[in-house]
């Protein structure tokens, strides 16, 4: 196996032969996915960094990697010993990709990026920036790794399965008609869907092509009278074939989508989402003389609002997940006191308990178990090299979730394993206050998550602290654990919040090399009231699991905070207790007992 330095040397040989001064490796695949199958993990292969977000850039004399605050510490560790320089996004003084390339390369240089895995919006922005940074040009039609990546994993070929109506809540025919109505409103004749979760949702199908994401690799072309699924036929079972045939959906090979788009259309308007569609496929559509209409896909907004069946599924999935979490938390402290547990063993125990639950289909992301200083690595993942023993003191941060056939879960709990410091208690309480403030929010229908973000941060800001990751994201219904368009974060996000959306509430605080705290519930946005000022919304927790009360400094909580926590814990006990045995029920009763101020 080649080392990172050997891979860089081989890449530079290819770059010289192609007269390229720099090459850019994004994190995405041909579908602009956040999490990608091994075939498309080019950035990881060339850099060694395995986080879900980041961009590697290699010039003939240097190499750099950009990533966000979730991965700063992990990236420092993974890039150590290589020539890569870590570029911290949103940190003052960090150059942009194009600025750094301009520092490294001569004016007029040619820069490469694989246009099959780079969205049209991204490449157009890069072209403009590189022109501005010294008249550099961007080449899109070349992937150097085809020459140097030996034994590259193939595009996955796992079987596709039906997602029954009893869990989907809406027929595929109904979804197709809703999408076609959007095409009519936008005066378009067709639409190419690239996003894998959008395709899975539209067709009520699921797959296992991407780790932890129940999707399959395909494209979907919709026209007013015709629907074509571009997918390798080996993935289609007899059952799925009959299902698609009944919907009059034609199947063509996955690798023929570009060829199909190049057909000589006449007076054909095709809708493409510039943020989801690769530059290569946009070029194919233009080569076919179609009139390309660049618009945001209507599907994410449709998918984001869960129907009654999906909401019921979330409640049921969260209940089963809560049972697994309670059993894990009951086991945790005694097991740690015995002295044989590590971060990896905690991960395995929690996964094993989830596997016992009905309709379990796998994890929704790789579990994060960060003990003490590892808790400060926002997206830490223990492995044989980093795994450490868990001691009966300090804090452990556990961020985990599962895929059930009727819903997807995402939960974080930070647990005191024994004595902790006053600073740890103070920060834990500040994070909890922010979590509560956001979950108690009442707000007008249609505002953006940006307008709510301050509620989760305000207690930390007041104390001079902050976290740099987002506060909340949408969650799919047996789909991707990160789902848009709704988000709660500091950066402006125009997507409006509406009843029926899911969103997480996950403020945190991380002190490098010391500890981290994060508390996360998955919430459902619901109608609250309607006044002369319009419709108002509120949020209710779908997650059912005790929040550790041991680290709380009660004097820092308001009466409203205390009432919220006690009400939440009463709900957790009432909902889960009947699913537990006697010992588990007693443990839960103690874990959810009301907190109160000390009497004077």
Regions found by a protein language model. Give the residues of each.
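Active-site neighborhoods and metal-handling regions in enzymes and metal-associated proteins
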Residues: 1-600
């Amino acid at each position: 196996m080649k080392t990172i330095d050997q891979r860089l040397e081989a890449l530079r040989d290819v770059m010289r032969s192609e007269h390229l001064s720099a090459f850019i490796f994004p994190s995405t695949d041909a579908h602009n996915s956040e999490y990608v199958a091994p075939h498309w993990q080019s950035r990881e292969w060339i850099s060694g960094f395995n986080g879900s977000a980041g961009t590697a850039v290699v010039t003939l004399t240097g190499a750099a990697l950009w990533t966000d605050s979730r991965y700063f510490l992990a990236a420092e560790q993974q890039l150590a010993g290589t020539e890569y320089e870590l570029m911290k996004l949103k940190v003052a003084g960090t150059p942009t990709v194009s600025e750094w390339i301009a520092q490294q390369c001569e004016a007029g240089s040619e820069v490469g990026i694989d246009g099959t895995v780079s969205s049209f919006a991204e490449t157009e922005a890069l072209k403009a920036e590189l022109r501005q940074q010294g008249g550099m040009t961007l080449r899109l039609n070349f992937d150097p790794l085809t020459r140097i990546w030996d034994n590259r994993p193939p595009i996955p070929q796992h079987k596709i399965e039906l997602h029954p109506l009893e869990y989907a809540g809406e027929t595929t025919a109904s979804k197709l008609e809703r999408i076609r109505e959007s095409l009519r409103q936008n005066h378009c004749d067709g639409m190419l869907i690239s996003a894998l979760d959008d395709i899975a949702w539209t067709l009520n199908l699921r797959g296992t092509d991407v780790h932890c994401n129940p999707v399959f690799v395909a494209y979907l072309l919709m026209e007013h009278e015709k629907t074509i699924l571009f997918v390798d036929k080996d993935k289609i079972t007899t059952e799925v074939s009959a299902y698609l045939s009944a919907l009059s959906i034609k199947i063509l090979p996955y690798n023929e989508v570009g060829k199909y788009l190049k057909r000589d259309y006449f007076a054909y308007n095709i809708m493409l989402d510039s943020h989801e569609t690769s530059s290569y496929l946009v070029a194919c559509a233009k080569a076919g003389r179609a009139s390309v209409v660049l618009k945001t896909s209507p599907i994410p907004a449709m998918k984001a609002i869960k129907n009654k069946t999906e909401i019921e599924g979330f409640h049921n999935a969260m209940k089963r997940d809560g049972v697994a979490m309670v059993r894990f938390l009951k086991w945790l402290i005694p097991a740690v006191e015995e002295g044989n547990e590590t971060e990896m063993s905690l991960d395995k125990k929690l996964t094993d308990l989830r596997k016992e639950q009905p309709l379990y289909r796998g994890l929704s992301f790789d579990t994060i178990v960060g003990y003490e200083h590892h808790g400060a690595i926002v997206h830490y993942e223990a492995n044989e090299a980093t795994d450490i023993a868990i001691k009966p003191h300090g804090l452990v941060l556990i961020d985990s979730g599962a895929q059930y056939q009727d819903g997807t879960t995402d939960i974080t709990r930070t647990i005191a394993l024994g004595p902790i410091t006053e600073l740890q208690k103070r920060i834990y309480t500040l994070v909890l206050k922010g979590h509560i403030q956001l979950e108690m929010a009442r707000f007008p229908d249609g505002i953006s998550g940006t307008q709510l973000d301050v509620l989760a941060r305000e207690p930390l800001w007041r104390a001079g602290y902050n976290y740099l990751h987002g506060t909340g994201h949408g969650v799919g219904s047996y789909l991707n654990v990160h789902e848009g368009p709704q988000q709660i974060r500091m950066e402006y996000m125009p997507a409006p919040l509406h009843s029926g959306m899911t969103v997480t509430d996950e403020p945190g605080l991380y002190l490098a090399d010391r500890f981290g705290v994060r508390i996360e519930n998955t919430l459902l946005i619901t109608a609250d009231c309607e006044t002369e000022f319009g419709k108002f919304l509120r949020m209710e927790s779908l997650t059912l699991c005790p929040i550790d009360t041991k680290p709380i400094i009660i004097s820092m909580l308001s009466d409203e905070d205390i009432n919220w926590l006690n009400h939440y814990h009463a709900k957790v006990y009432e909902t889960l207790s009947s699913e537990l045995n006697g010992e588990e029920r007693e443990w839960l009763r103690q874990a959810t007992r009301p907190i109160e101020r000390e009497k004077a």
